[in-house]
Swiss-Prot record:
Post-translational modification comment from the UniProt entry: One or more lysine residues are methylated.
UniProt name for this protein: Large ribosomal subunit protein uL11
Keyword Cytoplasm part of the UniProt annotation: no
Any one biological process term the GO annotation gives: translation
Length: 144
């Protein structure tokens, strides 16, 4: 007889700095209400994201009825990657009037390749268009 499947009781999506998860908000309250061992998650997440320190890494936590959990880390948000590559703190308050930085086509392609597993795109060209659109909406000019 095959083992019984665990019943899923919750799906939590968070964006946490890599290697810096701690029981303080937003992690503690989100996991606490599902009865998950918060420190166990923090240690596992910090170990899994140690190599990406400094970046914000989205995580999808699946909670089961026996209070156990599994989590999947995603690629950093496209907006954060664009800010990092452009070397700016934040996007433009008026993106269609005020441009704050420039990205080359090669930089956009590099970001698209990094984000490809999480993007809803069939090929790299479609992914580049998605990233370029995000950049434009932040007031970042894409050259090339």
């Amino acid at each position: 007889m095959p083992p019984k499947k665990k019943k899923v009781t919750g799906l939590i999506k968070l964006q946490i700095k890599a290697g810096a998860a701690n029981p303080a908000p937003p992690v503690g309250p989100a996991l606490g209400q599902h009865g998950v061992n918060i420190m166990e998650f923090c240690k596992a997440y910090n170990a899994a994201t140690e190599s990406q320190r400094g970046m914000v890494v989205p995580v999808e936590i699946t909670v089961y009825d026996d209070r156990s959990f599994t989590f999947i880390t995603k690629t950093p948000p496209a907006a954060r990657l664009i800010l990092k590559h452009a070397g700016i703190e934040k996007g433009s308050g008026e993106p269609h009037k005020t441009k704050v930085a420039k990205l080359t086509a090669a930089q956009v392609k590099e970001i698209a390749e990094l984000k490809m597993p999480d993007l809803n795109a069939n090929d790299i060209d479609a992914a580049v268009k998605i990233i370029a659109g995000t950049a434009r909406s932040m007031g970042v000019t894409v050259e090339g």
